[in-house]
Amino acid sequence: MIIRGFFSALIALAVLVQPTSADETCMSPYMAKIVGQEDYVYIWTLGLEGVGDGEDKLVTVDVNPDSETYAQVIHSISMGGRHEAHHSGLTDDRRYLWASGLDTSKIFIFDVHTDPAAPKLHRTIADFVEKTGGVVGPHTNYALPGRMLITGLSNNRDHGGRTGMAEYTNGGDFITSVWMPTDDNLQGAEKSGSFADGYGYDARALPRRNVLVTSSFTGWNNYMMNLGKMMGDAEAMKRFGNTVVIWDLHSRKPKKILDVPGAPLEIRCAWGSRSNYCFTTTALTSKVWLIYEDETGEWQAKAVADIGDASKIPLPVDISISADDNHLWINTWNDGLTRLYDISDPFAPKQIMEEQIGEQVNMVSQSWDGERVYFTSSLLANWDKTSASEGNDLQYFKLYKWDGKSLTPEFNLDFVELGLGAPHQMRFGAHALYGGMTAQSPSGLITTPPAH
């Protein structure tokens, strides 16, 4: 249930947020990384009625400054309707991009290797709910060796927050599913505090520690509900997750359930070979949480920083950790700000800058070298703002240059003006991934993932 002190403030504000995942520094450790200049950004975009064809679509933008079509939309492919386009993720070989819909529970698999500039629909998974035994709302698409791990947000019995995860082959064949631990079925997990709610959201792996970490949000009944209606429903406002679960990565069995009250969302794990910790933020309480392994080998959760003025409900959404583990970008949707935290001491993060990005801001993705930072705006169809104050953008894809001190705008694409819709998840592509450029190309790779 939601912390009481924030309940009335949320009702009064009548805003809540559904955020998402990020970019090159936040991808699966099983993947090669683009460490030079990315060539393309693939943007999973929510269709808007009255905007273009009104359909969800995968939009490709050229982001290589040496290209003749730099800062332009060079390709888009529509999905035949609106599915509540939300998250996407690449397979470990980066040949396929998986993109899912939270409403229809369909998953679209795109071929991004044959022609990285023009992805093609390879396969559609339309029986996700049936195959998984009732999981609804495929959310995070996360690469494991030869497999994709898909987290759910809901179920087909009561469309609440209890849910599970599924595994597929890279080609889209179902393997297995597992449900989140609950009070009535802990599945052998240790309940360390007050909660075992069975909710799901994001997932990240630390293979060298044999650990998988999952977070929790809310179910279909809430994320597909009209925002105003939901905010006026006291029972609906109680249905948000308060847990992070530590899993045995190899067996996929839950080990420990941690209390992280207030809807813990994105999980971002440190890259250092001795850095056994991850960060998350709570949407309802505006806090940074550290999920860490202590000196005894036990996993713990600790609130380590505030995000803005919690009384004003800034609503933290997407986060992105730098490749050197020293900085964490945190977007807050309600005020349209991005904030940068110094996390060199993970137990004492400090905010060092903030910047207005738009009327609302959701996703943040950075290049591996940290020099380029991308932003998009959309949350959910029934939750997005419908107008912007003077001087602020509403639905956009933006690139900024980062020099270690300040953000400098590079370009801004208005997705409504372009007839595309509401931009959400971003993923990077590069010709060098598929042998399409020489070793001297500005696009580069880490061919073997770093220790993680």
Residue ranges: model-predicted function:
Residues T91, G193-R339:
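Beta-propeller domains
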Residues Y70-T140:
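Blade-loop segments of beta-propeller domains
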Residues T25-A32, D53, G80-D92, E130-L144, ...:
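Beta-rich, blade/repeat-based domains predominating
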Residues S311-E390:
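Loop/turn-rich, solvent-exposed surfaces of beta-rich toroidal or solenoidal domains
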Residues D23-V63, Y70-R95, A99:
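Beta-strand-rich domains and repeat architectures in extracellular enzymes and scaffolds
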Residues I43-D53, T151-G161, S215-R239, T376-F397:
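Short, conserved, GDST-rich strand-edge loop motifs in beta-rich repeat architectures
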Residues V61-E68, I109-P119, T169-D173, L290-Q300, ...:
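Short loop/turn segments immediately following beta-strands, especially the blade-tip
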Residues H113-L206:
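Asp-box/WD-like beta-propeller blade repeats and closely related beta-sheet repeat scaffolds
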